[in-house]
A protein has these predicted regions:
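Divalent metal-coordination and catalytic microenvironments
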Residues: 32, 37, 63, 74, ...
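N-terminal-biased segments
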Residues: 66-108, 228-243, 253-255
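Metal-coordinating catalytic core of metallo-dependent amide/deamination hydrolases
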Residues: 139-256
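N-terminal metal-binding scaffold of metallo-dependent hydrolase/deaminase domains
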Residues: 1-53, 64-66
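Short coil/turn connectors at secondary-structure junctions
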Residues: 2-3, 54-56, 62, 125-128, ...
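Alpha-helical scaffold segments that flank or form the walls of functional sites
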Residues: 33, 83-153, 176-190
């Protein structure tokens, strides 16, 4: 958005009182005033008209309720086409649905189109901020950042890191993984409203070498985010126990 925009609607939002506690604000008739795409003021209709000259135009959305955008703190870009894919266990579901969907992102044009569609789907549902798993492909994560940047969306994302227990075309050795990740961090982390998250998928698909790589990258870039999965079902937990017999529990796999 460019220029100045005033929106009239019923408003609901969270704010902080003088003690710093969150309080719920509600205006039966209120205004949100934006300049150059940023909210600069939220106020009642009475206060708005008291300070604005007569005849100033605004967009009237009454009787609709205007609320802050939603935040999705865990979502996978390539799973937009496999929603509700059924399976009895997580590992079987990955083999049947998730991995085949992710293999398609090897195609650069496909990844670019799907990244743009994914961002549009989030925004159309009122989700204005998300933490996203991309795929193992560096160009797919790049396309995601490009699409989010074009819409000035707040996004935390990272390329998925896997080096075992997945289709061979979704595996990446440590050197290539480091190069792709460092390039994405340098280009996108802290750019606009974008941030990078180190993204080892989960312990089943990462060797100790790859997890050590994540630790090293985090030491080099301590302001990065980290996202993964843990303890989603019993079969997965048993598999992790077999792969990492020296660790006392699932969480210690990531901590050590």
């Amino acid at each position: 958005l460019s220029g100045r925009l005033s929106i009239r609607a019923r408003l609901l939002s969270l704010d902080k009182d003088l003690q710093g506690e969150l309080v719920l604000d509600y205006y039966e008739d209120g205004f949100v005033v934006c300049e150059e795409g940023l909210i600069v003021e939220v106020l009642s209709a009475d206060d708005y008209f008291a300070k604005m000259p007569s005849g100033v135009s605004y967009e009237d959305l009454r009787p609709y309720l205007l609320v802050p955008g939603f935040i999705d703190n865990h979502v996978h870009m390539p799973q937009q086409d496999i929603i509700a894919g059924r399976s009895s266990e997580l590992l079987d579901w990955l083999d049947r649905h998730a991995f085949p969907a992710e293999l398609r992102y090897a195609d650069h044009d496909f990844a670019r189109i799907k990244a743009a569609t994914f961002v549009d789907q989030l925004l159309s549902a009122g989700t204005t901020c998300a933490q996203v798993f991309s795929t193992v492909h560096g160009h797919a994560c790049e396309s995601l950042f490009v699409a989010a940047s074009a819409k000035k969306m707040c996004l935390v994302a990272g390329k998925v890191m896997m080096d075992r227990n997945a289709p061979v075309d979704l595996l990446q050795n440590a050197a290539d993984c480091r190069d792709d990740t460092e390039r994405l961090i340098a280009k996108w982390h802290g750019r606009g409203r974008l941030s990078y998250a180190l993204t080892p998928r989960f312990a089943v698909t990462s060797t100790e070498e790859q997890l050590s790589l994540c630790s090293d990258l985090l030491r080099r870039h301590p302001d990065l985010y980290v996202q993964t999965h843990i303890s989603e079902n019993l079969q997965e937990i048993d598999t992790v126990r077999a792969l990492f017999p020296r660790q006392r529990d699932y969480l210690e796999v990531y901590e050590h």
